[in-house]
């Protein structure tokens, strides 16, 4: 993203008549992510939320449909927020690298999701397109699962959990037939370790990829969410 905005700044400053054209397969998610990033970089908007709302409003043709046509995937919106931080706090530079050790994952409001206790889940952790860790809860493979029935939650404690740095993708599969969405999994998300504070990341339902969609809300209740807990190596 930083290379992209630097390239666009150079191009746009070369001639006032210059324009940029950004596209992807659908012209919504990935395109919107980069458009919103440029809107922040060029001082047209100060924050990620305003730029995302503006892009969605301009891209939605209300004469044809009221369906929102902006950036919808939460992880894409999250990275627009990361860019806002890089611009305002780090002078358009990457923040200092922050390696973290993943200790455990807590699934909130898990009743009715799969077997309702986390035992059907498989967790995959991917860095730079490489699978760096996998645990199978049913077999207690590389993890132990602790149902917290009183709090409607389940804790997956990773055994020899990975040390990760930079962009991290976390995918959840289910052996209990949970409906699949994008990436052919029930739910997943991306984050970057440099933006983790207090060794904890909490993502509510509307910040998880796939459960953010209203059509899934009969399964994923309003207080569904995922917490990840880290330690410093």
Identify the meaning behind each predicted range.
Residues 1-21, 26-233:
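PTP/DSP superfamily signal
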């Amino acid at each position: 993203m930083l290379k992209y905005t630097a390239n666009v700044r150079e191009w746009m400053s070369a001639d006032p008549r210059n324009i940029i054209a950004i596209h992807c397969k659908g012209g919504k998610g990935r395109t919107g992510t980069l458009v919103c990033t440029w809107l922040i970089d060029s001082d047209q908007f100060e924050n990620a939320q305003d730029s995302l709302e503006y892009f969605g409003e301009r891209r939605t043709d209300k004469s044809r449909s009221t369906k929102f046509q902006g950036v919808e995937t939460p992880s894409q919106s999250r990275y627009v927020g990361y860019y806002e931080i890089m611009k305002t706090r780090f002078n358009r530079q990457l923040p200092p690298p922050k390696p973290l050790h993943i200790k455990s994952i807590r699934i909130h409001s898990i009743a009715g999701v799969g077997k309702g206790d986390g035992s059907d889940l498989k967790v995959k952790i991917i860095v730079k397109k490489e699978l760096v860790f996998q645990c199978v809860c049913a077999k207690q493979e590389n993890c132990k699962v602790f149902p917290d029935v009183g709090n409607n939650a389940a804790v997956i404690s990773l055994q020899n959990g990975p040390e990760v740095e930079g962009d991290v993708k976390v995918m959840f599969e289910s052996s209990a037939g949970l409906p699949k969405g994008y990436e052919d999994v029930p739910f997943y998300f991306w984050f970057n370790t440099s933006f983790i504070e207090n060794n904890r990341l909490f993502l509510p339902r509307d910040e998880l990829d796939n459960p953010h969609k209203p059509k899934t809300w009969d399964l994923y209740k309003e207080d569904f969410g995922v917490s990840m807990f880290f330690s410093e190596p």
